[in-house]
Amino acid sequence: MTTKEQFFFKGATSKNKIHFISLGCSRNLVDSEVMLGILLKAGYEATELLREADYLILNTCGFLKAARDESTDYLQRIINEKKETAKIILTGCMVSKHKEELKPWLPYVHYVLGSGDVEHILSAIESKESGEKLSSKSYLEMGEVPRKLSTPKHYAYLKIAEGCRKRCAFCIIPTIKGGLRSKPLEQVMKEFRLLLKMGVKEIILIAQDLGDYGKDLSKDRKSCLYSVLREMLKEPGNYWIRMLYLYPDEVDDTLIDLMEKDQRLLPYVDIPLQHINNRVLKKMLRTTSREQILDLLTKLRTRIPHIYIRSSLIVGFPGETEEEFQELVNFVGEGWIDNLGIFSYSQEKGSLAAEMPDQIPQSVKSKRLKILSQTQKKNVEKHNKQFVGKIVEAVIDGYHPDSEFLLTARFYGQAPEVDPCIIVNEARLVSGFGERYLIEITGYVGYDLVGRVVNKVPGE
């Protein structure tokens, strides 16, 4: 797994300049946005220049070894490049679970905050005692927390819960983030309305397990996701709601009904399946079987033919045989999944799977990863060919990272950052980013579609 760094900045002139680097997932990004909001509200200014900053905050990712390596690489860079008087504040998942890996760098770190301990960022910066360790406490418990969005102004992530009650054998997230802690419905709605008021047009709901939302709050331990979605959809406006991290056992008829009835709840679901073989799923401690997965996918495709399904799969889990891997290849080859993230199993200390026998050699895992990736690439190429000549409604995100002569756009089946996009090479009609346009698909490059703007969507 690779992490995506996010830098936060604007023009800074004071002596209280801060420089943020946020690594990892969108959930980490939300924490960084809250910390940034707290500091800006307190009078600090953000700078894009590392050497200019008085305080450097690194929000680490500790999910996989590759992510931890990236975190320590960034930490070393900060130590090497910062000005002599600058202070380093370290936070995030790696701090909570893998502090021993940080030992060589800790003498250079001035403050350490636990994962999710974002509301104490101001206390950390203003503390007189270098190296103070602040208690871990999620900002979800706070009623009023400022936030500075780092995403383009037209979309934002809304984290509705923290932690996870599931205990998948390969995962250490519960030991990092703790158990499920849901925001109260009133707080979620307050944040939702605020984002709409700020002009956000696409709100992406996230949690470790979105479908578990509210099970820690309700007396019957049932999910409250349907209730919060229903409340959100009562708000007027032509906005999009996108759901990420929705486990297969939590997708029920009530959610499907909502997607059918209100187009603002996008016909897009991110369902981490991890595998399709029953024996492997059982060893992973997953709660769904092959039969249940296929029943769910069939229902989704039948009820909502235009739905887009994103998922993640793991190859090389301990004991995975060639036959079981081939079953996974066949499943992917059937084209059930539109957007797919494929990961090679990582032996994470503290996970149940790390102690399992029959660990798969890295060479075998790499080979299986390549085979499965090639299988999905064929699906994508076939799918993209069928798109050529069609006109889709898409939002213009901004300039393409490789060229300001190109723009990037997304239709409802593409989530930002994790999915492919539309490369727009004819955009004379575009008057602003964050607006929706009709785009004719003229071709494709790899996983991305290519298109030209035909017209602006009426009402935009």
Swiss-Prot record:
Coiled coil residues, start to end: none
Cofactor binding mode and count: Binds 2 [4Fe-4S] clusters. One cluster is coordinated with 3 cysteines and an exchangeable S-adenosyl-L-methionine.
Chief localisation class: cytoplasm
EC identifiers of the protein: 2.8.4.4
Keyword Ion transport annotated: no
Domain MTTase N-terminal, chain residue ranges per copy: 16-130
Functional note: Catalyzes the methylthiolation of an aspartic acid residue of ribosomal protein uS12.
Family indicated by similarity: Belongs to the methylthiotransferase family. RimO subfamily.
Annotated protein name in UniProt: Ribosomal protein uS12 methylthiotransferase RimO
